[in-house]
């Protein structure tokens, strides 16, 4: 029978803490929401980030984390669970170390909380399951491996214009409702299908409904068996939401270090991590910084991002969804996160409104991997030309809106036509949306994407319908769609001609 995480923290840590560190049991002296002050009489205090276990009669124990030493005999801790029912005078047990979460094969296919407790309908974890602390440093610089290998996603616009690095960090920036979570789910699908690696998903401060839907979708698609889901939901205390990425990182680091397996680490949403940190900062009495964020914003983001690293033989590839409040890309949280990523995938509300999914802005998105030494000369040349054509089209949109496209010169009209076709060609159906759209998902090789864009830039598709290039995979798929449309037009014209021919004599007779 499985023990609760809080029980394991207490069982594994209390004897060690009291014997080795001399920390005696404490007692609660104040409760202010999620902040709990604890007094210790032995003269030795638990270290910062150590876990404390607070038993409650008739309820699961509360796990808290030490964040400040108030005096020689008291600490301030942050509860990772609801503190309802907690009273002054309650006993507190020090564990002698940071929170430890389960890792290894036992957690594959499971949904876990910030403390590693299963949140699905599966069996309890065994008491002897391997565990790792959530607080660890980044690998030494000498052991880290730079990210230069391409991480092909099968998503045309990403692979062409903002390629991801295997072992690198990529962030998808966008406001509410532009498709960040759908992109994350598609990338999980790509990882399982293409790389046969492990995926670790951290749901940070997101809706419970979305987490439930993702769990069911993964079960249905068969990818859950190689995925670990770690959730700190929107309704949980800020401490839980703040520590969820560290729990996910501890699990990913285990598979990287102990199993030498490639790991795809997905975090949705990193902005909620910053938001939870701001709440924690306020609860602990720190003065806010710009726009109300915590004064330690930059260091907290850096501590998280620098742990995402690759070593010889195994890579952790991080893909992070970042909510942009009020579509303001100058927000301090957004700029702090952007400073650490290799690839920036910017989602556009305007493109989403036009139905251009994935709604990725081809001009604003960028990647340090878009370099001839990494992806090759041909790739870079096509990417630059695609960006140039689409950017020129955007410059002409105001003129078109005022005067109409017929007032443009021949060269500008040609650029407009090719830019619109490129925008449509860079859309594609996703496997994870097949149940809603009825259209099978398409995964496209980078070579096919480059060849298709080069053909459009060359003018090979100037006489094609724009709709033939919309929501297809390769250019061959678009060609078949165009041929089918032309055949349908020919049949319709033939039927119309036959109908008008048969109506001709009758019309003449009625005229007489």
UniProtKB/Swiss-Prot annotation:
Recorded hits in HAMAP family, A to Z, give: ATP_synth_beta_bact (MF_01347)
Q: How does the UniProt record describe the way this protein sits in the membrane?
A: Peripheral membrane protein
Name which cysteines form disulfide bonds.
none
> Is the Ion transport keyword given for this protein?
yes
**What top-level branch of life does the organism fall under?**
Bacteria
Q: What does this protein do?
A: Produces ATP from ADP in the presence of a proton gradient across the membrane. The catalytic sites are hosted primarily by the beta subunits.
List GO terms (cellular component aspect): plasma membrane; proton-transporting ATP synthase complex
Listed Pfam families:
ATP-synt_ab (PF00006), ATP-synt_ab_N (PF02874), ATP-synt_VA_C (PF22919)
Q: Which InterPro entries match?
A: AAA+_ATPase, ATP-synt_VA_C, ATP_synth_F1_bsu, ATPase_a/bsu_AS, ATPase_alpha/beta_chains, ATPase_F1/V1/A1_a/bsu_N, ATPase_F1/V1/A1_a/bsu_N_sf, ATPase_F1/V1/A1_a/bsu_nucl-bd
On assembly, the entry states: F-type ATPases have 2 components, CF(1) - the catalytic core - and CF(0) - the membrane proton channel. CF(1) has five subunits: alpha(3), beta(3), gamma(1), delta(1), epsilon(1). CF(0) has three main subunits: a(1), b(2) and c(9-12). The alpha and beta chains form an alternating ring which encloses part of the gamma chain. CF(1) is attached to CF(0) by a central stalk formed by the gamma and epsilon chains, while a peripheral stalk is formed by the delta and b chains.
Q: Name one GO molecular function term.
A: ATP hydrolysis activity
Q: Which UniProt keywords apply?
A: ATP synthesis, ATP-binding, Cell inner membrane, Cell membrane, CF(1), Hydrogen ion transport, Ion transport, Membrane, Nucleotide-binding, Translocase, Transport
Q: Supply the CDD domains for this chain.
A: ATP-synt_F1_beta_C, F1-ATPase_beta_CD
- Organism listed in the record: Burkholderia thailandensis (strain ATCC 700388 / DSM 13276 / CCUG 48851 / CIP 106301 / E264)
Q: Per UniProt, what is the name of the gene that codes for the protein in this document?
A: atpD2
UniProt feature, compositional bias: Basic and acidic residues:
479-494
Homology family: Belongs to the ATPase alpha/beta chains family.
Q: What class of enzyme is it?
A: translocase
Q: Which reaction does it catalyse?
A: ATP + H2O + 4 H(+)(in) = ADP + phosphate + 5 H(+)(out)
Q: Where located?
A: Cell inner membrane
The name of this protein is ATP synthase subunit beta 2
Which residues make up the binding site for ATP?
174-181
């Amino acid at each position: 029978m499985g023990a609760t995480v809080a029980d394991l923290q207490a069982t594994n840590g209390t004897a060690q803490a009291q014997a080795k560190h001399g920390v005696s049991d404490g007692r609660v002296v104040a409760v202010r929401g999620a902040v709990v002050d604890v007094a210790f009489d032995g003269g030795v205090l638990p270290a910062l980030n150590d876990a404390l276990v607070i038993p409650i009669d008739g309820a699961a124990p509360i796990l808290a984390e030490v964040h400040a030493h108030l005096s020689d005999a008291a600490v301030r801790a942050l509860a990772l669970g609801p503190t309802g029912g907690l009273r002054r005078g309650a006993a507190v047990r020090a564990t002698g170390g940071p929170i430890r979460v389960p890792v290894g094969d036992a957690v594959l296919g499971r949904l876990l909380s910030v403390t590693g407790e299963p949140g699905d309908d599966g069996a309890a974890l065994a008491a002897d399951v391997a565990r790792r602390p959530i607080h660890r440093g980044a690998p030494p610089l000498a052991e880290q491996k730079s990210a230069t290998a391409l991480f092909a996603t099968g998503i045309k616009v990403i692979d062409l214009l903002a390629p991801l690095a295997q072992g690198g960090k990529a962030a998808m920036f966008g406001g509410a409702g532009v498709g960040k979570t759908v992109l994350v789910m598609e990338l999980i699908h790509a990882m399982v299908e293409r790389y046969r690696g492990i995926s670790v998903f951290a749901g940070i401060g997101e809706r419970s409904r979305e987490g439930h839907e993702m769990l069911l979708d993964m079960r249905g698609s068969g990818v859950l068996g190689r995925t670990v889901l770690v959730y700190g939901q929107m309704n949980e205390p800020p401490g839980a939401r703040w520590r969820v990425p560290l729990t996910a990182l501890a699990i990913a680091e285990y598979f990287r270090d102990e199993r030498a397996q490639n790991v795809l680490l997905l975090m949705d949403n990193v902005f909620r991590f910053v938001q939870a940190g701001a709440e924690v900062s306020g609860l602990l009495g720190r003065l806010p910084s710009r726009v109300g964020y915590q004064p330690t914003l930059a260091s907290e983001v850096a501590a998280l991002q620098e742990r995402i690293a690759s070593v010889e033989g195994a890579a952790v590839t991080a893909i992070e969804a970042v909510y942009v409040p009020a579509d303001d890309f100058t927000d301090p949280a957004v700029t702090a996160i952007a400073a650490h990523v290799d690839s920036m995938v910017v989602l556009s509300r305007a493109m989403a409104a036009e139905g251009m999914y994935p709604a990725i802005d081809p001009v604003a998105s960028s990647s340090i991997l878009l370099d001839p030494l990494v992806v090759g000369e041909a790739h870079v040349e096509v990417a630059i030309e695609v960006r140039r054509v689409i950017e020129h089209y955007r410059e002409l949109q105001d003129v078109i809106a005022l005067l109409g496209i017929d007032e443009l010169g021949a060269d500008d009209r040609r650029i407009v036509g090719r830019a619109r076709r490129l925008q449509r060609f860079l859309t594609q159906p996703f496997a994870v949306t097949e149940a809603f759209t009825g259209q099978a998902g398409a995964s496209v090789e980078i070579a096919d994407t480059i060849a298709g864009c080069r053909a459009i830039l060359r003018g090979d598709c100037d006489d094609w319908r724009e709709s033939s290039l919309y929501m297809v995979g390769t250019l061959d798929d678009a060609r078949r769609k165009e041929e089918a449309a032309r055949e349908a037009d020919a049949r319709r014209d033939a039927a119309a001609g036959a109908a008008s021919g048969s109506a001709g004599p009758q019309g003449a007779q009625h005229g007489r």
